[in-house]
């Protein structure tokens, strides 16, 4: 018996479990894309798969809906692959193991992939059903959404006929998203020089942070494990500790708030009283600043042996410290027009170092194009002042709120009929593919919604089973709506 047997809606959870069984992290969606192609063929549906793995599946209108405007259902095939430190799975090759925990579906030691596997499951369940009335449907499933919306940016929509698009990539039931931020990825490259250094290697691990989605959870005041390394190194400097940087790592993806990081230093005499004093000071500061948002935050020190090491020279070590300390991160500005909406932010999501350079990877977001450009300029200028350079990629536009929208009006009317109350109409700080699609398809009318998903992009991710069922009924009602 499968782990999700007995859950309703049965078809949705059947396909979601099928999706979990096929590895589909970003850049590794081919198997899932091929699965969907075979699904379309088995159901006699027209399907186009491009070189990247993006899909367009078409289904004709059911009887009585032939004259209704067509609808596009849209989601993405890829997921963020993150796991706990003790999880043995390779998410590029291994299946996710979903389990039921009370009223939720979660995964054993990994991200669940509800973002956006639930959209794919909804779409396949609709296409598979014989009893759901709907107009002509076009299902658009993209790849590499989580790494800069690359699939949507590259996909050619020459044969897309519909002009009303339902994106199922929002994570709060009752919220109809009608606008989102634009974004860009930034890589900061800092050249380093290594020299022979003799001493004791000491690894410092920042662990126990909550992490989270850098779009939807950036405003929650959570610590950034990579940025905290700059605080740690600065405390050592202030305490008169002599050290040379040996290794650096942190984070998993640019768009995930890093929950763990580490820096390995070569110290002349190991963990001295000065090091312990700095560690105690660090722990006290972190508890005072992040005790509510990250109650389990912790710094662990581990001696890793004595000897001669190829470590960073003094200049490179201090430039690395300054970069980790000074690089901006987190919320930079709140919207002056929409209460509670983050306008501009950046997330320092990944840190790594090889023999020649240290690399810091950011995800920058803003609903104001000029603010996005200014923040990119600041990061570039600071990097150049520290002797490095930057590379920009993955730029995508904001999705601007439309004052008039027939699709939004439909979704509001259906919501009021089903729930007995008005939905919240909102813009979101996370990037959605609606911005790219609206820019490429003239006259496209978009809306985004989805069931309750908690702690996305982390191993604590979970999908609310009852919410998945309610949103399924809501989606079916939208499909069955007649103007």
Label the model's feature ranges.
Residues 158, 222-239, 267-272, 316-325, ...:
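His/Asp/Glu-rich mid-to-C-terminal helical/loop segments that flank catalytic regions of hydrolases
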Residues 254-330, 334:
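A conserved active-site cap/scaffold subdomain adjacent to cofactor or substrate pockets
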Residues 65-156, 162-163, 198-201, 314-317, ...:
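Active-site metal-coordination/substrate-binding segment of hydrolases
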Residues 17-21, 264, 298-310, 347-351, ...:
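A short beta-alpha structural unit
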Residues 2-104:
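Acidic/His- and Gly-rich active-site-bordering loop/insert found
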Residues 134-225, 233, 237:
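Fold-level recognition of mixed alpha/beta catalytic cores in primary-metabolism enzymes, strongest
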Residues 222-227, 231-248, 401-444:
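Active-site-adjacent substrate-binding region
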Residues 9-12, 336, 343-358, 363, ...:
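Zn-dependent metallopeptidase/amidohydrolase metal-coordination segment
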């Amino acid at each position: 018996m499968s782990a999700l047997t007995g859950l309703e809606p049965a078809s949705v959870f059947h396909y979601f479990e099928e999706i979990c069984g096929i590895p589909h992290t970003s850049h590794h969606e081919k198997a899932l894309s091929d699965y969907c192609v075979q699904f379309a063929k088995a159901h006699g549906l027209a399907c186009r798969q491009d070189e990247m793995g993006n899909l367009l599946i078409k289904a004709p209108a059911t009887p009585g809906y032939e004259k209704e405007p067509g609808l596009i259902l849209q989601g993405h095939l890829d997921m963020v692959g993150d796991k706990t430190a003790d999880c043995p799975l390779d998410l590029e090759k291994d299946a996710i193991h979903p389990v039921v925990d009370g009223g939720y579906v979660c995964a054993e030691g990994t991200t669940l992939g509800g973002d956006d596997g639930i959209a794919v499951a909804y779409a396949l369940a609709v296409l598979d059903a014989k009893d759901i009335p709907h107009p002509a449907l076009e299902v658009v499933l993209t790849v590499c959404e989580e790494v800069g919306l690359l699939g949507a940016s590259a996909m050619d929509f020459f044969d897309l006929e519909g002009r009303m698009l339902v994106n199922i990539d929002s994570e709060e039931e009752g919220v109809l998203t009608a606008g989102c931020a634009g974004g860009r990825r930034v890589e900061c490259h800092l050249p380093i020089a290594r020299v022979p250094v003799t001493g004791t290697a000491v690894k410092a691990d920042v662990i126990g942070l909550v992490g989270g989605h850098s779009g939807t959870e950036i405003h929650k005041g959570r610590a950034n494990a990579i940025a905290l390394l700059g605080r740690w190194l600065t405390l050592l400097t202030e305490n008169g500790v002599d050290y040379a940087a040996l290794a650096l790592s942190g984070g998993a993806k640019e768009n995930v708030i890093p929950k763990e990081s580490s820096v390995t230093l070569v110290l002349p005499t190991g963990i001295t009283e000065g090091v312990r004093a700095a560690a105690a000071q660090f722990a006290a500061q972190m508890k005072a600043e992040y005790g509510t948002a990250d109650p389990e935050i912790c710094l662990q020190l581990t001696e890793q042996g004595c000897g001669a090491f190829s470590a960073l020279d003094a200049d490179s070590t201090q430039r690395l410290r300054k970069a980790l300390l000074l690089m901006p991160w987190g919320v930079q500005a709140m919207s002056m027009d929409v209460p509670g909406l983050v306008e501009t932010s950046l997330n320092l999501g990944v840190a790594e170092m090889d023999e020649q350079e240290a690399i810091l990877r950011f995800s920058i977001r803003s609903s104001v194009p000029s603010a996005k450009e200014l923040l990119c300029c600041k990061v570039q200028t600071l990097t150049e002042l520290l002797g490095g350079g930057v590379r920009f990629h993955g730029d995508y536009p904001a999705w601007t709120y439309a004052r008039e929208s027939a699709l939004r009006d439909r979704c509001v009317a259906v919501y009021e009929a089903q729930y007995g109350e008005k939905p919240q109409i909102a813009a979101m700080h996370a990037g959605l593919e609606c911005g790219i699609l609206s820019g490429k398809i003239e006259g496209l009318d978009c809306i985004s919604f989805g069931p309750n998903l908690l702690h996305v992009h982390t191993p604590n991710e979970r999908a609310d089973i009852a919410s998945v069922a309610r949103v399924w009924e809501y989606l079916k009602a939208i499909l069955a709506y007649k103007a």
